[in-house]
């Protein structure tokens, strides 16, 4: 079975061999540290996210939106052409553009707090300003990621379930949220843990249900989610939700997603 066939059937793919060297990873981690400490090589602050720019919950997940704005090594990683090429091949499209990225810092859970969790969800619920669901996420492990430190969990095949849950049903209580999912007849709720060595990358479809639990290790879990959009997808105002990208890069009905917020990562315009 080819990677494309596996992705089409399961809604995810894991590049198990690291794509990046130890030196690359050291640069990415340092860049992440700089951004979390409000040091931006480009001079531009990323968009506000969860528990950031003011970190009020030291045990809570830190999620920094559009971290690539800050420049430096994280920007280079977010626009990495090798990742873009794999994403293009998995979606079976002509090319992909940046949608947005998210730096993810999951601290060790020193109590039974849920604030380090990312509840079960489908990205597509929040991205319906797009006229097609041809979007994909590359999740880059910046250190080793395993079950103990809260590896992302995926429900294989759930990208074929349509809108299986409402955005309003998402909570940090994993079991409670799972009980709300509309599972089609004949399908099963099966969890796959995306355990990755540092430098390895997983990919998942915009409709694939995913989430992550607490970090029970003694070190933070570090990752970068690069959300990419197929180069043929256009803006529509028919979606239920708007999107924060539109605040910095407004669109007219039917516009392609291009420009400073949506550079081409892989495709004819980069070759």
Question: Language-model segments: what does each one mean?
Answer:
Residues 1-10, 16-120, 128-129, 167, ...:
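Non-heme Fe(II)-dependent double-stranded beta-helix
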Residues 42, 46-50, 55, 201-203, ...:
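Non-heme Fe(II)/2-oxoglutarate
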Residues 121, 128-147, 195-196, 203, ...:
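Short, conserved beta-strand element in jelly-roll/cupin
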Residues 47, 116-122, 171-188, 220, ...:
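Short, surface-exposed loop/helix-turn segments at secondary-structure junctions
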Residues 110, 116, 120, 130-131, ...:
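A short secondary-structure junction signal
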Residues 86, 124-129, 140-143, 187-193, ...:
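Short helix-to-loop capping/linker segments positioned immediately adjacent to catalytic or ligand/cofactor-binding
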Residues 145-209:
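Double-stranded beta-helix
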Residues 106-108, 155-162, 221, 227-233:
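Short edge-strand/loop segments of extracellular domains
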